[in-house]
């Protein structure tokens, strides 16, 4: 690739403060433009209206066309997830051939330090079915060429690359779904996009973990150190492993089965959407030195294969439990979070996610219905500490406090 071509492409991406500025514009329903007084009539003829008058110019606004509004919504979603680089505007193009004049217009280009997503957007005013044979085959036919271009742009990084076909108000035919599967292209309909938009509102940039777990399901995470000191035991007829792990590692392989239409193919699902307020309180608690000694419950999915556990040389005789090294799957979406999603995701934006260890109890290859039953058993049998006992315990804890405020709370001061 010519250096000039490379620089032109890189200059068409935004990051940092520039990304924030573009996001601000894309998040709005209207386009804005400042014009001279003599051009107002012409702009009004084209559907613009006066937004604000200044001494030397007029600020005009016009509602975005439907296709632009949809693309901007999708663009904004990935920006809010914390992806570092996105295309500056709708004129972004990538070569797909040795002839660099042959280029493909890209609706949305998304990148971070590990991932690149290329997104094609289609929207209709009202729900309908359409034939996307030509569009899908065009993307599929140029896919390898576009990947080659990306590798030439970033020769020092082995990116995970995924193509996404995002639609709104379209019903895809079986033939189109088959074409997407054949080319390895993922379909995001409006329900899927809405789910990730809601998730991002609650989780912020942490929602990216759930996204990556979905689109890269089963793919290897080569840099992950998956060896964990663990205890193997039996309980209720099930084999389980108890261990401590850095939240950062579990976040990479973890996945939460939220109950929503976007996860309908994974039914039965059982988790409610993570609450933003609760997540923030967990992170604040952790960042201020707090910790949760109770275990997060997960199910490790190895596609029916046995998990590798290297027993240590010295074991306690006559003990059912065994100590050793557990080898976790080095794959996205291989650990389903049954209980403790707030405790885990509370670490996602914390500086302690790589330096703290959280306790985990892991079952292996539980059926989805077994996960649901376990989730229900845990939540049905948990009881909050009664208020009377909580007040008594607080009094005991604060009795010897040297803090005047805490003394006043229990009437000691």
List each language-model region with its residue ranges.
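Short helix-terminating capping/connector loops at secondary-structure junctions
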Residues: 153-160, 290-292, 354-355
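Intrinsically disordered, low-complexity Ser/Thr/Pro/Gly-rich regulatory segments
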Residues: 1-222
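Amphipathic alpha-helical segments that form well-ordered structural scaffolds
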Residues: 73-80, 281, 285, 346
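Short, flexible/disordered intra-domain loops and linkers
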Residues: 98-99, 127-137, 270, 306-313, ...
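Short amphipathic alpha-helices and their capping/turn segments at secondary-structure boundaries
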Residues: 107-112, 282-286, 411
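N-terminal leader or domain-start segments enriched in small/polar residues
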Residues: 169-331, 362-365
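Extended hydrophobic secondary-structure segments that form protein cores and membrane-embedded regions
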Residues: 161-169, 359-363, 413
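Basic- and aromatic-enriched surface patches that contact anionic nucleotides/nucleic acids
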Residues: 292-304, 310-412
């Amino acid at each position: 690739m010519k250096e000039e071509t490379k620089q032109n492409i890189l200059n068409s991406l935004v990051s940092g403060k520039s990304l924030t500025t573009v996001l601000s514009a894309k998040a709005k329903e209207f386009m804005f433009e400042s014009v001279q007084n003599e051009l107002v009539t012409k702009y009004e003829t084209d559907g613009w209206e006066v937004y604000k008058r200044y001494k030397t110019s007029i600020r005009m606004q016009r509602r975005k066309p439907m296709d632009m509004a949809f693309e901007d919504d999708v663009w904004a979603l990935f920006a809010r997830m914390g992806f570092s680089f996105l295309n500056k505007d709708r004129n972004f193009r990538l070569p797909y051939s040795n002839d660099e004049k042959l280029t493909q217009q890209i609706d949305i280009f998304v990148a971070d330090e590990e991932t690149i997503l290329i997104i094609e957007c289609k929207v209709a005013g009202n729900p309908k079915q359409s034939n996307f044979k030509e569009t899908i085959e065009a993307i599929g036919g140029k896919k390898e060429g576009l990947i080659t271009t990306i590798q030439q742009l970033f020769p020092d990084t082995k990116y995970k690359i995924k193509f996404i076909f995002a639609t709104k108000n379209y019903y895809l035919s079986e033939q189109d779904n088959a074409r997407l599967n054949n080319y390895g292209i993922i379909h995001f309909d409006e329900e899927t996009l809405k789910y990730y938009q809601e998730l991002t509102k609650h989780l912020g940039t942490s929602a990216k973990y759930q996204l990556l777990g979905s689109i890269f399901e089963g793919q290897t995470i080569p840099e992950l150190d998956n060896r964990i000191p663990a205890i193997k035991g039996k309980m209720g007829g099930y084999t389980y492993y108890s261990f401590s792990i850095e939240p950062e590692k579990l976040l990479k392989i973890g996945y939460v089965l939220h109950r929503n239409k976007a996860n309908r193919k994974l039914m039965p699902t059982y988790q409610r959407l993570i609450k933003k307020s609760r997540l923030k309180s967990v992170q604040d608690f952790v960042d201020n030195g707090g910790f949760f000694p109770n275990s997060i419950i997960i199910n490790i999915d190895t596609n029916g294969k046995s998990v590798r556990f290297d027993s240590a040389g010295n074991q306690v005789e006559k003990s059912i439990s065994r100590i050793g090294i557990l080898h976790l799957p080095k794959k996205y979406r291989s650990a389903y979070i049954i209980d403790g999603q707030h405790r885990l995701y509370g670490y996602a934006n914390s500086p302690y996610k790589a330096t703290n260890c959280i306790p985990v109890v892991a079952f292996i290859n539980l059926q989805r219905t077994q996960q649901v039953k376990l989730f229900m058993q845990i939540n049905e049998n948990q009881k909050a500490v009664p208020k009377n006992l909580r007040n008594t315990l607080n009094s005991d804890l604060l009795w010897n406090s040297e803090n005047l405020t805490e003394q006043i709370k229990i009437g000691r001061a």
